[in-house]
Every structure is written in C-alpha cells, then in structure tokens.
C-alpha cells in the first residue's frame, strides 16, 4: 500500500531547504493544521447551505437562490454577513455567562472533531491513534452546551428545547458508539487511518458497509438525530417551541448554532464515508492503477494521483450522504418525542448491542473476513 503524502514532512523539508532549522519549521507548521480545519469546515458549511437551499427549492418546484452570484452561490455568504451585523442581544433576566458559553460549547467540540478525519494516508491533521475514542468524547460535550443555552435563556420554550436536545443526544449517543465499536473490532484499531486502510484490500468489495449493513444504518440514523435533522428536529420544532433552545439568540451567537449544526452534518457524513465507505480508497485497488500507469505503488506520480483523487473520493462520498440528508428533510414527517426516545432506547440500542455481539462471533468464526 502506498504510504501517501506526508504534508508535515514535505512542508518542513521545503522550509529547511530555504535555510530554516527543523525547530523553526515545526513552529511555523503548528498553527497551519487548525487554520486548514477551520477553512475546510467553513467551505463545507457554505457548500452545504447552498445545496440545501437549491435542493429544497427543487423539491418544492421553486428556483431558490439566483441573484447572489452565479446560481446563488454567494447566498450563504450573504446570510453569514447578515448575522454578523445583527445586534447581539442578551435577555434581561438571562444568565449572561452561561448564555454566552452555551453556543461555544456546541461549536468547539464539533470543530475539534475534524482533527481526526483522514483524507489520505497522511492527509489528516492528527493521527492520535485513538481518534474514534476522541470523537465520541468530544461529541458528548455538545449536550451540555445545548442544555446550558436553554436554561440560561430564562425562557420556557428555550428550556424545553434544551431538555429535548440533551435527552435526544444522550439517547442516540449510545447506539451510535456501539455501532462504531463493531467497526473498531473488525479493524483492531481506534485510528481512523487504520480503519480506512483495513478497507483498501479489494477496492469496493472490501468496504465495511457490506460487512456492517446494520451498523451502517444505525450510525446514519443516530447521526441524523445528533445533527437534529428531520425527522429528528424535536429540539427546535417551530410549531411547538418557536425555535427551541435558540429562541432568545440573535446575531453572532445564533450564527454559532447555525454553524455547529451544518459542520456537524458534514462531519457525520465524512465519518460515515471513513468508517463504512472506504474513505479515500478507490473503488479499484491502487495496485491496478499503478500497473496501468507502468509505475510502482510508491512512485511519486502514483502518490500524487492517489492523494488528489483520495480527497475527491472522500468529499464525494460525504456529499452524497449530505444530499440524502437534505432529501430526507422534505420527505419524512417529524416524529413525536415519545417515538423518538422509543426508537433510540427500545429499538436501536438492542439492535446495536446485538450487532456488536454478532460481529464478535463472526470475528472468531471467520477471522480473515472480519479482521481476526
């Protein structure tokens, strides 16, 4: 298997070629990954918001954004600028500190979770070795921010929305974690890079979605619930709770919730692509591509092609799932809160636990096929 492109090593060697010491080159590199994450997340949000507006318009037989740039591509930027210039209001009887801290606790863990998303063998910010555990830990912080925002607003609709959001997130966090553990068990690693590498043996046929179809469905349903997408948008049901925990927010604080929701949707889609759809992997083995080019797998030309196409493959798989999530918004009705909790605790949790046990049994019975 090709070792891929090591961005940090290439960047460091380039700076050392200009006469800088390795220590200085490392210091210059340190802020760049976070800037890259923020840039990728913001671009992902802009593209997703534009897609949602255009797809929603197409479903409703409308045109959608048209005048803000070609095909309305600048409309998301106009929305962001509008929120930036709006007045930042804190209700008189609200808890100012918690009211401000809530949106931050919602957004920051989602952005930090992007650190573990690999776009290639070495095209990721941090291969910590326990990336899946880190992501689950960070995602468990978000309900605290949602509940804090609802409580601090001193508004009954906000409080009910915060309680719903916390209950929903906790209910679906457990089956989601169990579904991921089945994949971890097959790959024998908590590293997202190792999980993708484990799926690159036979191209399309080695993707985890074929060995974990139940886990794939559980993960996707739970991811939609975690992102509060229809049919699971109970925390901000307009007909019942005005805007849920966001009711009293305006301006930049509201924009943080807005960003967090869409960044989380793109992140969830990327993780589905990484865990179940082969990540950056080709539908065909890399060895075949190298053979057609008459090069070795480790040749620079093959590394550049696989690195570039790997990024495209990861993004395409993720946005296919984003497209599906947007379509589901307009084709499924909102469930009731009791149905939401019943689905999580009485249906998805037992199935996820059973899927984990069956995966363990298959791993023992068929170690070659299930990563023994």
Curated annotation (Swiss-Prot):
Q: Which GO terms describe its molecular function?
A: NADH dehydrogenase activity; oxidoreductase activity, acting on NAD(P)H, quinone or similar compound as acceptor; quinone binding
Tell me the domain of life: Bacteria
Asked if Translocase is a keyword of the record, the answer is yes
Tell me how this protein sits in the membrane.
Multi-pass membrane protein
UniProt-listed Enzyme Commission number(s) = 7.1.1.-
Q: Give the record's family classification.
A: Belongs to the complex I subunit 1 family.
PANTHER family, from UniProt? NADH DEHYDROGENASE SUBUNIT 1 (PTHR11432), NADH-UBIQUINONE OXIDOREDUCTASE CHAIN 1 (PTHR11432:SF3)
Q: What is this protein called?
A: NAD(P)H-quinone oxidoreductase subunit 1
Give the originating organism: Prochlorococcus marinus (strain MIT 9313)
């Amino acid at each position: 298997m090709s070792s891929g492109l090591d961005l940090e090593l290439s960047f460091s060697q380039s700076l050392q070629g200009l006469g800088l010491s390795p220590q200085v080159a490392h210091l210059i590199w340190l802020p760049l990954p976070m800037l890259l994450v923020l840039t990728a997340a913001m671009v992902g949000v802009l593209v997703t918001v534009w897609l949602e507006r255009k797809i929603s318009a197409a479903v409703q037989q409308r045109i959608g954004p048209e005048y803000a740039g070609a095909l309305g591509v600048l409309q998301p930027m106009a929305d962001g600028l509008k929120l930036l210039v709006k007045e930042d209001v804190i209700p008189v009887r609200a808890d100012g500190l918690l009211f401000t801290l809530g949106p931050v606790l919602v957004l920051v863990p989602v952005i930090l979770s992007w650190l573990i998303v690999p776009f290639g063998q070495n095209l990721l910010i941090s291969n910590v070795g326990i990336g899946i555990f880190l992501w689950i830990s960070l995602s468990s912080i978000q309900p605290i921010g949602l509940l804090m925002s609802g409580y601090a607003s001193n508004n009954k609709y906000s409080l009910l929305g915060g309680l719903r959001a916390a209950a929903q997130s906790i209910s679906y966090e457990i089956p989601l974690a169990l579904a991921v553990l089945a994949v971890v068990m097959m790959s024998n690693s908590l590293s997202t890079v190792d999980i993708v590498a484990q799926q690159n043996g036979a191209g399309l046929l080695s993707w985890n979605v074929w060995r974990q179809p139940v886990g794939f469905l559980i993960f996707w349903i739970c991811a939609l619930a975690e992102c509060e997408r229809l049919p699971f948008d109970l925390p901000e049901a307009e007909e019942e709770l005005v805007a849920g925990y966001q009711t009293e927010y305006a301006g930049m604080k509201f924009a943080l919730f807005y960003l967090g929701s869409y960044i989380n949707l793109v992140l969830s889609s990327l993780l589905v692509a990484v865990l179940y759809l082969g990540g950056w992997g080709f539908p065909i083995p890399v060895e075949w591509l190298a053979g057609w080019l008459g090069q070795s797998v480790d040749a620079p030309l093959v590394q550049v092609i696989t690195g570039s196409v790997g990024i495209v493959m990861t993004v395409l798989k993720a946005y296919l799932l984003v497209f599906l999530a947007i379509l589901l918004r307009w084709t499924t009705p909102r469930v009731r809160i009791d149905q939401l909790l019943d689905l999580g605790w009485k249906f998805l949790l037992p199935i996820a636990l059973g899927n984990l046990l069956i995966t363990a049994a298959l791993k023992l019975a068929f170690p070659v096929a299930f990563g023994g």
